[in-house]
Amino acid sequence: CPTPDAPQYACCLHGMPTFRESNPNPATRAVSTPNKLFDFKSLGYNYDNLDFHGMDTAHLEAAIKKQKQKDRVFAGFLLHGIKTSADVHLKVCNAADCHEAGVVFVLGARTEMPWHFDRNYKMDITDVLHEMHIPMEALFENDSKIHLEVEIQSVDGAILDSHSLPTPSLIYAPAKGLVSQHIEDHDTETLIRKNVNSLSPSEIKNLRDALVAVQADKSGNGYQKIASYHGMPLSCHYPNGTAFACCQHGMVTFPHWHRLYMKQMEDAMKAKGAKIGIPYWDWTTTFSHLPFLVTEPKNNPFHHGYIDVADTKTTRNPRPQLFDDPEQGDQSFFYRQIAFALEQRDFCDFEIQFEMGHNAIHSWVGGSSPYGMSTLHYTSYDPLFYLHHSNTDRIWAIWQALQKYRGLPYNSANCEINKLKKPMMPFSSDDNPNEVTKAHSTGTKHLNKIQEKDRVFAGFLLRAIGQSADVNFDICRKDGECKFGGTFCVLGGQHEMAWAFDRLFLYDISRTLLQLRLDAHDDFDVKVTIMGIDGKSLPTTLLPPPTILFKPGTGTQLTR
């Protein structure tokens, strides 16, 4: 699949190769191109509901619209692959006074496919600017000293070059008005994915029995083969023969590839007797422990997986911030991340916010474990991966329902169109026994309160850094007082495909600015640190310095 511009990266640029070649599942092989995957119901599954924190589609859209009725500032990041996973620590700076504004986690590995976003990933830094007493007007002054700085740290703790990613920019988003919409009902399908915490004892037993059988299956529909699609052993190859991980992340086809991947595993379990779909773990709600389905140690195939290629078991080493909100907000860290993603009205803008929100679960569940969720190469061997991605896919389905309610496109994308029409490996492979996935292997109250306020975001431009890492950042006043601004996770590995977002990942630093008695008019700094999953600091140059973006609230008047 060579191209004139990047022959060595043909698999990434032209589809999802892992699901096309040597795929024993004809269902996933038949639908292995992204543009066939917008309609998840065509794959034969549905969710028990698409509510978000008790809000149906109509109420969720109303809450989002209210949130957008204020001016906001974002840090805009143009992200791309940096060959490793890393944390990008953002700082908002007013001259030399820098304050932590948040952290972005980039998922990647040395052998990843090249990727980049074609628009900004946005991080809300409105609150950080407020806390730093920086007026919005200051953002537009010719001699403004307001800027963003980042420190990039890989998962092994090494500090990466801060110029590994473009310097984030400040983005101003004015308040939006309200538009009346209608609700459209949807039919349900027989195969239902349920909340993991609502499963009955008989459903738990049924799922465990099915997974035991899949794990014992050594064929192309078995656990080891399907798990290998995501990372090790490497299944995709450049034209020169170099192998790389087939997982697509940091690119527009991330949701499509993983939707098909979930279908592949779900069909394997269904073939072994599963009566319901893979349950979803709704990590946007506050939780203090992992789901019981995966923590019960006895006679439980969901407790861990075995990795034949490494001759070891998967392990988990949860970080404290998984259960204790690092930002100490009113709602959970994950709720805030996904709520902002759902605000987006364009698929390409939604995708980056959505993907980065999902990354933190990988990093904070796996922690420093070399064979766990935080590693791109082995994450898919942990059964918890599939509960996590069932919820990730459900969030995409929620956004699609919102788009239909808004009267906006919900099953198409206008960025990187070429990728949406190319087969995704290994689903499109002639060896894929799953005809469904083969056919779809191409692709064309708290919330209201938040939305009433001005917001400031730190924007990070993310790309592959070759490993997984946590990105943390502080917001600092010019007098030296600093407070934690935020954290996010970069998922990656040595063999990941090259990737880079072409837009900024946005992180809300409004609350931190308020804590520091600052606003958008004040001078402040953003100090970023990046730490790998092994605890080693990474150079901040792995990622460009973040930019600050302001989103004014309802009625905010801004003169330039």
UniProtKB/Swiss-Prot annotation:
UniProt cross-references to Pfam families, sorted A to Z: Haemocyan_bet_s, Tyrosinase
Cofactor binding, per record: Binds 2 copper ions per heterodimer.
Glycosylation: residue positions: 142, 240
Paired cysteines (S-S): 1-11, 93-98, 236-246, 348-415, 476-482
Cross-link (2'-(S-cysteinyl)-histidine (Cys-His)), chain numbering: 12-14, 247-249
Region: Unit G, residue numbers: 1-184
GO MF entry, a single one: metal ion binding
Cofactor: Cu(2+)
Residues at which Cu cation B binds: 358, 362, 389
Region (Unit H) residue spans: 185-560
UniProt: Cu cation A binding residues: 230, 249, 258
Keywords in alphabetical order: Copper, Disulfide bond, Glycoprotein, Metal-binding, Oxygen transport, Repeat, Thioether bond, Transport
Subunit (UniProt): Decamers of large identical subunits (390 kDa), each containing 8 globular oxygen-binding functional units.
Family stated for the protein in its record: Belongs to the tyrosinase family. Hemocyanin subfamily.
Function: Hemocyanins are copper-containing oxygen carriers occurring freely dissolved in the hemolymph of many mollusks and arthropods.
Family annotation (PANTHER family): SHKT DOMAIN-CONTAINING PROTEIN (PTHR11474:SF76), TYROSINASE FAMILY MEMBER (PTHR11474)
Name the UniProt record assigns to this protein: Hemocyanin, units G and H
Record organism: Sepia officinalis
